[in-house]
Structure formats: structure tokens, C-alpha cells
């Protein structure tokens, strides 16, 4: 940990003692800076441009060194707008990479790529900071034991379980419940694992970032009265930011998460929305730096950049960072280099279905499209694996029969198929669950369902023990005992009506 050289105020004396250079060229967000002989900054060093623009406004722009050009010149990428900068302006080499505040002071706050608060709630304690560029943990520090990361969400834990310290891709369009699922995961990791979360908004809409913040305050994930008791830190570098900021905001969020893992020894959830925008920003910067483009116009360093981010997201003997990354697939082309490079790093995929959301089944996780490398008998055990496979087979058969049902009706099916359909409909409804963060608008109390309870519930449905219960008894309940209680309640209500 070190004092943060980039967080100093424009007149701070600590910056005045550093090496000084001058701007010699400005091309959009890219600056060429000349330094005296023997005073060249290192790659990834933070440079600060200070001065006044043509109308006398104070300028304070932080840049990051990307290339050494020769002739005592460096090329740097700006982390904020370069409006008002001029050739000949003074540039200060801070002598260190960008550093951002870390630790408990970050919880409940919103930061930009430089680790500066942007939520108008006053300054943040930045005595403890950490550089955003680091090496991944050494092999000897890694925790190689494969273990399930229990989320308390039935459909995820049973059919596409998350790996502790793994990376999960979240696929889903607008309005299918991505934000609510993210908030529920943040809530559950705090309650069940004593962990915290870091949300990195990378190149997405500012409106969505604002909506997420407001919903987090409403649901209690961010505690307005006692900010330190919040469960999440937010880091935003949205669509309106220059490409340099969008390219580095993921690393800022990851650096905050690493501190919770390595120093506080906590389990951390790191959300990146959207990992594609990280690649897109890298592509823009690559073109501005004059590199030859690679396949489909992407940067030639695509795999290296993705690897340098993803390899830092892992489990160590101290704690874990489990990452959930929203993946935008351009033109639905899964072979596009950006999503294809991302897939190589993922351990599981959670696919949200518009069809299920339209039926009112939330979370709208598609049980057949969602996958996980953890769903193997040697990892999850034979019972879990067999129940998950039988659930998938039942739902798959129901899917195959839907066309016949639509044309001919249920009566034309065989006895066996009718039983399969009845159980599949119960399973489909039992995969729904009331969320803690959705209590505000559903009126139902949230439920955390342990993995053993989830397996027991689906085993009982598949074994036929609940063939006599109505399917609506399984909708929006926690464990199977709640479903039987709901069935009795429904029966009483129908008897009273008679």
C-alpha cells in the first residue's frame, strides 16, 4: 500500500517534486509528452497535467503512459476529457501507477476510474490505497480445491452452480431481471458468507448505473444512514467516458476487490457490466496508439489484455473473488473475437430467458441453456448430479411436447407424458423464488434456500410424492415444506368458497 500520488489536489507540493515534461502533441484522448533526458517515466506511470485553459479554468487531467516513442517522448492515454489542453502545458510524472482507495471506506460509495468519489457524499479516506496494475497471485498462493459457491438461489445452485473463485457469464437482454439477480447475489453473499461485493460499471449507460444505485439504496444493499454498513462498493466508467477510463475502470474495481480478499480475508463478489465494453475500449485505445488491428478490427493484444484482468480474479488461501460478468454478444455472433475470448475464461453461464420472465417466473434463469463446469459427480456428488440431470431431462421432454400440446391438447398425450408434463410444470414453478431485494414490489418475504434443501425438494417432486398437489403451490416459495403448507392453505381457501 502507498500514498496516492494521483489523488492530490492541484496545488499539492508532493506533485511539484516529481519529474516534469511538456505536451508536444494531442490527438483526441492521446497525448505525446516530452521529458528531459534521463527523466523518462515508466510504462503505466500516472501523469498529471495541470494548468489553466484559454478561459482561465483550472485543468487537472490524469493520464497513463502506454508507449515509449524514443527521442525522450512518451505516449499517454487520458482518463478524462482533454478539452482545454494545449501544447507546451506542464506534465508531472507521479512516479507510480494509478492508485485508488481500498478497504472499508469504499463501501456504499461510487467512484470513478481514478478512485475519486462521484456521489456528492464528501471525501473518502484515501490513506490506504493500492495500484491498479498488479501481477496475478503466484501459483503457490492459489487455492486449487474445487468448491461450490452457494448462492441460496435454487435454480443456480442446482442446475448451474457457481465455483468459489470462478468466473460466471451473465447473458440476458433488457428487462429480464439482470439487475434484481445481481442485487440478490450481493445481498446473499453478505448474509451467508459475510462477504462484500464490488460492482464495476464498464462502458454501460449512465441511466442504468443511476437506477442500480437507487435500487440498492431502496433495498438496503446500500445503507444511507450508516454508509460503512453497506455491502457494496460501486465503480463507474460509463459510455460517456473517454476510452482510457473505460479500459481501466475494470482494473479499479478489481483492485478494490483484491484488498477485501487479500487483506480482510473475505469472500468477494465482483460484478463487471459489461466485459465486452472493456474489450471495446481497449480496441479504441489500440487504434489511437497506432497499432495494427487484428481480426475483425480488434486490438492485436486482445488475449493478453483479457488474461491480465481475468487471471487476477481467483481463489487464494486467504479468500476468493468470484466474478459475475455480463456479456454482450455483438450481432448475436458467438464467434466474434470479444465474446469468444471471454468464454475461454468462464466456469459457468447464467442465461436469463424472456419467455420465463413473460410467464412471471423469477429469477428468469433458463434451466436448459445455463451451464456450469462444476456440475460433475466428482465435484457436487452423485445425488446432486443425478437430481440435476433428471430435472433437465423432465424439462427437456416438456419442451419437446409443447408443440403437440398446443395443437392437440393434453388429452392426446400418453399417461406417462401427462405425468412428465405435470411434474415439469411443478419443477418450473418451484425454480422460482421470492427475493429479499424484491420484497418492496412483490410483497413476499425473501427466501434463502440451502443446497441440501434444494436437492431434497426436487427429489421429492421427481419421486412423485407431490403429484397430488396443485402446481400453483410451488410458485414463489422457498423450500418444499413451504410448498406443502401453501397447498394446504389453497385447499382451505377453495373449501371455504364452496
Swiss-Prot record:
ATP binds at residues 172-179. Its EC number is 7.1.2.2. Keywords: ATP synthesis, ATP-binding, CF(1), Chloroplast, Hydrogen ion transport, Ion transport, Membrane, Nucleotide-binding, Plastid, Thylakoid, Translocase, Transport. One of its GO terms (molecular function) is ATP hydrolysis activity. The keyword Plastid applies. Disulfide bonds: none annotated. It catalyses: ATP + H2O + 4 H(+)(in) = ADP + phosphate + 5 H(+)(out). The keyword Transport applies. F-type ATPases have 2 components, CF(1) - the catalytic core - and CF(0) - the membrane proton channel. CF(1) has five subunits: alpha(3), beta(3), gamma(1), delta(1), epsilon(1). CF(0) has four main subunits: a(1), b(1), b'(1) and c(9-12). This is ATP synthase subunit beta, chloroplastic. The gene is atpB.
